[in-house]
Swiss-Prot record:
The lineage of its organism: Bacteria, Pseudomonadati, Pseudomonadota, Alphaproteobacteria, Hyphomicrobiales. This is Uridylate kinase. One of its GO terms (cellular component) is cytosol. Residues 21-26 are annotated as: Involved in allosteric activation by GTP. InterPro entries: AceGlu_kinase-like_sf, Asp/Glu/Uridylate_kinase, Uridylate_kinase, Uridylate_kinase_bac. One of its GO terms (biological process) is UDP biosynthetic process. The keyword Transferase applies. ATP binds at K13, A14, S15, G16, G56, R60, T163, Q164, Y169, D172. GO terms for molecular function: ATP binding; UMP kinase activity. Allosterically activated by GTP. Inhibited by UTP. Keywords: Allosteric enzyme, ATP-binding, Cytoplasm, Kinase, Nucleotide-binding, Pyrimidine biosynthesis, Transferase. It catalyses: UMP + ATP = UDP + ADP. Catalyzes the reversible phosphorylation of UMP to UDP.
Amino acid sequence: MSAKPIYKRVLLKASGEALMGSQGFGIDVAVADRIASDIAEARAMGVEVGVVVGGGNIFRGVAVASKGGDRVTGDHMGMLATVINALALATSLRKLDIDTVVLSAIAMPEICESFSQRATLYHLSLGRVVIFAGGTGNPFFTTDSAAALRAAEMGAEAIFKGTQVDGIYSADPKKDPSATRFDRLTHSEILEKGLAVMDVAAVALARENAIPIVVFSIHEKGGFTEILTGGGRATIVTDN
């Protein structure tokens, strides 16, 4: 297999759950360091990388609504959780001497820069890893939707969705041993089959902008970079 990457610019989506590792809450620094190592390898290959991180390891906005609270406030709390995760991942990357910037959809200038497409493209042009925090900056949108949105804005050639398993299955393979794994799908098939890999808005936005989605296990060290060169194990979602 050639070590030459088949993608030049990608968006990596890492869930808060992934950063939690085997812990019940918070950030496992060893996991953050491992993900950072994979990103560093991608940068060494010349791939430009943007990252969207979730916040579910710290807080989920829907939890507030399920207890009778205000969903908007809950989502704002969830957005703040993504900022914490973004700063943690940025710290892990900087330990590897990877130039990294955090851009937040919610203005907090004392902590990180504010998001704009112009800032994103500028930092990418300088070879920096760009971590997007704060989701879309609006309630009622998931970080999957933020990933699709940022991928479109940065001109990403693919969205790499790091999950708990090595691709898209017909059902949760951890609960259903008979679940079937898909090697390739279209965006439309995901929507038609109701496959729970990303929310409907995210998949629709990726389809509209013809952005492939690559679903892989974020827990396999080196898996991200292996897939970047055309190998590895993943489900590839395209528009045809």
